[in-house]
């Protein structure tokens, strides 16, 4: 018996040793292959404006292309100083320096090391004084370098030296408006007296509110939220007449299920200061719920995503077993049947959130998902935390459902800011099925990145806007061989899996133009050369008499030929193709109704996709329908994916330097962000006018602003160049004689072009009787000059607008910026 006991003890000890040894081996293996995303470590930098904290800046791990760093705008104090506060978190701040650059980054005006750093509560403080001369009313870039430990981290803001900006009045108004809305208190009438409620406003949703919403709606209805992260105002645009501010913050509230929920809120304010008070010109509020799987998120027909202002997207496998969706910086995967809900990726930190968590200058794009739940996705933009913290680029990940793990396959480092990078990746970002190649469009170039050897091949460069389209889900890329938007007769389609090209051509009296992709099927249009109108730059018309949907085998899947009208463009949203159409009249082309084409493989939206339900406190909520019936009270099994390294591999990393822009582009910034890009100034001004925004050129020079013009203006005609006085509107001749950039503003309104008169530049305008020169204006009239005459005359504003519109709103002026 004793021998048996001894033998049992020995066996137990051997087994324990074996288990211990195995666990050590497994533990070591996991340590080698499993990674936990590091918490955010970069400091935040704020501007201290007379005791008010504004313009929160997020750090970059490398120097960025300053042309793309158009975020906040900081007004200099009277002595040309910017006071900053650095929130170090766990960092030791050893030094701070700053550099002042021209708006395009081509000139460095000064580079200074701060000799004395201060301390205020939990912040490190520094005074950044601009010592060298800079122009007034001109924007510059301030690049701040903060050394935290052994790392140099870069922060960017625009600066301006200008008087009478009323900055503090705008800040006081915006923060006061926010507080009264949050507290539900409008006893002094501040809210009711500044908003413009009307019948068209949607007062049934908290997801999006604006200046036309009711006061009760702006005060959050029945939700009664509490502040979790208070807003730090960000100045986006600022001049003598108007200001644009944005505020990001987080609130918590108890919803209809009596569970605590969290929301990320963004508010946009456009204001004017007049008669000693601030006037609210425009206001918008977007609210997005931070998805919490611990709450009651399963409902009878799917997943409750809550309040969402953003256009959400989802992807599912062909069997509709797996549903993937991204929300507020996190990617989730839901498996029907098992009710497993996996957090595949998230930038949100564990524990208490801070401003780094809600910095949403990034985007998650789901490329594909298979019948086993395996997925490929991209992370594009600013990396809030992790090994790429502070970098701006594209990370390519794969998710393995069997092991609940993600693997980084490729990281593409760029110097392009998120606003531009996201538009490039939206056009094309595709990884091959065998995971050996990644295809990307970036700044007009098409790249093939070999993941196995980290090589980058630029397949095409200098592609013009409107001359190429891509499909990230279908793995296709199409481009006009001639690279001319209005004069190309060959459209090539490449299958990125096989590398095979298919060419689509037209008759000699026709031209082609790509529209987009529906999954992997290419949509393009055909126009007759005789119908194409390119006479007025910026108002070109490419009237397509037919639209074709084709596959990579060259087969025509559908032909669309509208009766009595033409297609001038289109857009694809999932499987829905929307076509913009015009009719031909004696005066040219006029807009008519849109038409829609639905792909034959479109999902049955009755069972799948997004739906909206009403509730008492939260009003309208989004549901992702999953095609199943879920019992009330069902809770999901929540899993969290781990990040692992591929066995024996490191993720490929490549860097693509900033490209020199060869195409003249105009950037429209509106409501605090990049709105759109155009190749013509007239299109850009029309869009900015509609969106209450601004236009900048390739050099980031401000080229047009909505609402920033003098009340009255009369120019000295003796200073007008002779070529302007001659009244000739020939663009080439004007460019040659002026030696400046000539702006063709055809299609813009009179009110829009008066901005240039206010800036001191005359405008040529066509009328039925010939050309006149706009030399000034007042509240009721334009001041006009006929070529060859020496005296100006007044003409009513409304009559002038009608006269110019009858002649096609044809205006020409030139850009005459202040020189250093």
Language model features by range: what are they?
Residues 140, 237-251, 373-379, 522-527, ...:
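A short hydrophobic beta-strand element
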Residues 490-492, 502-536, 540-575, 580-582, ...:
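Extended, charge-rich low-complexity regions and/or helical-solenoid scaffolds
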Residues 1-15:
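N-terminal Sec-pathway targeting helices
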Residues 36, 40-101, 106-108, 139-223, ...:
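Core segments of small alpha/beta cavity-forming domains
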Residues 336-339, 401-402, 450-454, 495-499, ...:
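Short loop/turn segments that connect beta-strands within beta-propeller blades
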Residues 110-113, 283, 341-350, 406-414, ...:
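Beta-propeller fold detector
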Residues 20-30, 67-83, 94-123, 127-144, ...:
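Surface-exposed, charged secondary-structure patches
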Residues 712-820:
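Conserved active-site-adjacent core of cysteine acyl-enzyme catalytic domains
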């Amino acid at each position: 018996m004793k021998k048996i006991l001894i033998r049992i003890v020995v066996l137990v000890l051997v087994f324990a040793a074996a288990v211990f040894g195995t666990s050590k081996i497994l533990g070591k293996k996991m340590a080698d292959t499993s990674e936990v995303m590091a918490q955010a470590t970069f400091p935040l930098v704020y501007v201290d404006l007379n005791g008010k904290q504004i313009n929160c800046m997020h750090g970059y791990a490398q120097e960025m292309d300053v042309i793309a760093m158009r975020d906040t705008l900081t007004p200099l104090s009277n002595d040309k100083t910017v006071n900053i506060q650095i929130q170090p978190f766990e960092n030791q701040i050893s030094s701070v320096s700053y550099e002042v650059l021209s708006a395009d980054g081509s000139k460095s005006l000064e580079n200074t090391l701060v000799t004395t750093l201060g301390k205020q509560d939990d912040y490190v403080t520094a005074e950044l004084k601009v010592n060298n001369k800079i122009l007034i009313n001109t924007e510059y870039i301030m690049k701040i370098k903060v050394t935290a430990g052994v790392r140099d981290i870069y922060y960017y803001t625009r600066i301006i030296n200008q008087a009478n900006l009323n900055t503090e009045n705008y800040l006081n108004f915006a923060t006061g408006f926010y507080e009264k809305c949050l507290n539900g208190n409008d006893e002094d009438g501040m809210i009711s007296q500044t908003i413009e409620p009307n019948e068209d406003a949607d007062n049934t949703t908290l997801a999006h509110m604006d200046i036309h919403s009711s006061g009760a709606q702006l005060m959050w209805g029945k939700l009664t939220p509490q502040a979790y992260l208070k807003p730090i105002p960000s100045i986006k645009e600022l001049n003598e007449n108007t200001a644009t501010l944005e505020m990001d913050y987080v609130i918590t509230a108890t919803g209809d299920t009596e569970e605590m929920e969290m929301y990320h809120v963004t508010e946009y304010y456009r204001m004017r200061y007049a008669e000693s008070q601030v006037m609210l010109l425009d206001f918008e509020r977007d609210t997005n719920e931070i998805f919490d799987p611990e709450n009651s998120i399963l409902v009878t027909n799917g997943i409750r995503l809550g309040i969402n202002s953003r256009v959400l997207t989802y992807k599912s496998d062909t069997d509709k077993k797996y549903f993937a969706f991204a929300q507020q910086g996190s990617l989730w995967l839901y498996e029907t049947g098992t009710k497993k809900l996996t957090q595949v990726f998230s930038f949100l930190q564990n524990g208490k959130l801070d401003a780094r968590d809600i910095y949403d200058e990034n985007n998650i794009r789901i490329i594909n998902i298979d019948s086993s739940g395996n997925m490929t996705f991209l992370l594009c933009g600013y990396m809030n935390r992790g090994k790429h913290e502070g970098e701006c680029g594209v990370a390519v990940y794969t998710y393995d459902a069997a092991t609940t793990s993600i693997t980084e396959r490729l990281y593409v480092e760029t110097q392009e800011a998120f606003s531009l990078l996201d538009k490039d990746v939206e056009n094309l970002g595709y990884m091959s099925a065998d995971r050996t190649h990644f295809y990307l469009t970036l700044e007009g170039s098409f790249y093939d990145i070999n993941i196995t050897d980290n090589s980058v091949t630029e397949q095409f460069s200098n592609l013009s806007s409107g001359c190429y389209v891509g499909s990230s889900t279908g793995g296709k890329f199409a481009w006009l061989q001639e690279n001319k938007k209005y004069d190309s007769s060959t459209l090539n389609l490449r299958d990125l899996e096989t590398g095979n090209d298919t060419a689509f051509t037209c008759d000699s009296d026709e031209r082609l133009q790509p529209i987009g992709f529906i999954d992997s099927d290419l949509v393009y249009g055909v126009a007759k050369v005789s119908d194409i109108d390119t006479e007025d730059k910026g108002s070109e018309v490419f009237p397509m008499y037919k639209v074709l949907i084709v596959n990579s085998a060259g087969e025509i899947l559908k032909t669309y030929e509208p009766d009595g009208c033409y297609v001038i463009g289109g857009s694809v949203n999932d499987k829905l193709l929307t076509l913009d159409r015009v009719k031909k009249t004696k005066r040219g082309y006029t807009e008519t109704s849109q038409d829609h084409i639905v792909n034959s493989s479109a999902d049955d939206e009755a069972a799948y996709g997004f739906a909206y339900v009403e509730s008492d406190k939260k009003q309208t909520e989004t549901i992702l329908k999953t095609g199943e019936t879920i019992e009330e009270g069902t809770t999901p099994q929540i899993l969290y994916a781990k990040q692992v390294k591929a066995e024996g591999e490191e993720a490929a990393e490549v860097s693509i330097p900033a490209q020199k822009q060869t195409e003249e582009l105009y950037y429209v910034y509106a409501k605090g962000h990049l709105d759109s890009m155009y190749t013509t100034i007239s299109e850009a001004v029309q869009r900015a006018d509609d969106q209450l925004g601004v236009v900048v050129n390739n050099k980031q020079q401000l080229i047009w602003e909505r609402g920033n013009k003098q009340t009255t203006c009369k120019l000295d005609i003796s200073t007008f160049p002779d070529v302007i006085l001659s009244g000739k509107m020939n663009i080439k001749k004007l460019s040659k004689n002026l030696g400046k950039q000539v702006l063709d503003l055809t299609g813009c309104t009179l009110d829009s072009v008066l901005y240039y008169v206010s800036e001191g530049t005359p405008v040529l305008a066509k009328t039925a009787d010939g050309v006149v020169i706009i030399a000034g204006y007042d509240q009721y009239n334009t001041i006009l000059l006929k070529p060859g005459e020496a005296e100006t005359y007044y003409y009513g504003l409304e009559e002038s607008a009608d006269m110019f519109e009858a002649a096609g709103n044809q205006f020409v002026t030139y850009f005459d910026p202040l020189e250093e």
